[in-house]
Structure formats: C-alpha cells, structure tokens
Amino acid sequence: MIAIIDYGVGNLFSLKSSLKQLGLEAVVTADADTIRKADRLILPGVGAFADAMAKLEATGLVPVMKEEAERKPLLGICLGMQLLFEKSYEYGEHEGLGFVKGEVCPLEPDLADKSLKVPQIGWNALHLVKDDPLFQYIREGEYVYYVHSYYGKNCTESTLAVSDYSIPVTGAVRAGRVYGTQFHPEKSGDTGLRILKAFAEL
C-alpha cells in the first residue's frame, strides 16, 4: 500500500487516480499509523515552500516521515521534492526536511531566449545522469511535465536526472531511500506512469 501524505497542499486525488490506473492500492492520509503501515510514501505538493513546510510540521508527521524513510521508499513530487532539501530561498530563507544536501533556488533561465519563461510550465526532455531503478522503464530523453519557479541546486551527488532550460534543471534526486521528482509523474502521460510503476517496485 502507498500512503499519499495529506497536509493540505496539492492535488492528491489526481496522483491517487494515476496509481489506481496502475492497479496499485493508495490511500490519501494524515494518519501516522497508516503511514507506518504503508510500504511506500509519497509527499506531493504545490505552492510556496514556507507555507507548505509550516503545514507539514503542523500535522506532526515530520518525525514519522523521517523515521519511516529509513526503512521504506519515499517520493517527493514537485514542491514535495523541494521540501526534501536542506533549505529554500523562496521569499526568504527557510529550513527544509534535510534529506537531500543542497538548496532550492529561483529558476533563472537565459531570458534572452524569449521562449523561456518563469515558471517553467510544460513538457521537457529528461536526461538521465545516473542509472537508477526509478527509471528502469523509461529511456533517455523521454518527456515529462513541469510546473515550477524554483529548483534544487548544489545537489550533484544526489542528482539522478536533469532537464535543459538554458540551465541544467534538477529533474530528479535520490538520497538513500528518499527520491524526488521536480516534474509531475501523474501529469506526464505514459512516461510518468512507468516511473510510478518503478517506484511501486522499489
């Protein structure tokens, strides 16, 4: 069973629907016991870092997540991935969960290229920089869907994949059993479903 952590941020039910499409059992929950019983955890999220971190801390689930991530796979998606980092510079400086060494910084592409805007909204090719079971069902250069204005930086040792937005944008990270994708697998069509399938098999 996959527990989708509900802390009042993000479209949890489109993610649950994608997992159901794969024949996977998933529950949307803020219950610590359910999270402990789950085989895998997903931390979704959209919006601002500080607000999301405050809401997550208010649930009392941060210690539970840290404990469970020692024993089972955890996947952060979009803002959920950013929360995995040590800190963010979105509207000030804010501490994150600290699973991934690095920081979350503003997306600053070369705006001389008029086709590049912030936020990055849309499809971009995913370039795999390390072999990992998370990507066992996809090929180099498949397209995934992004919606973001900030990205993970200074995290080379954890980076699994990048996308080009005139600068290399961290697309996916891993630290131990903890994974993150800046893109939305649940919005990335068949490619995203294959990534979620791989996560369910970790």
Spans of features found by a protein language model:
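Structural alpha-helical scaffold elements that stabilize or flank donor/cofactor-binding regions
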Residues: 34-35, 68, 172
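Short acidic low-complexity segments
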Residues: 26-37
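Amide-donor transfer/coupling interface in amidating biosynthetic enzymes
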Residues: 103-202
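N-terminal beta1-alpha1 ligand-phosphate binding loop
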Residues: 2-24, 183-187
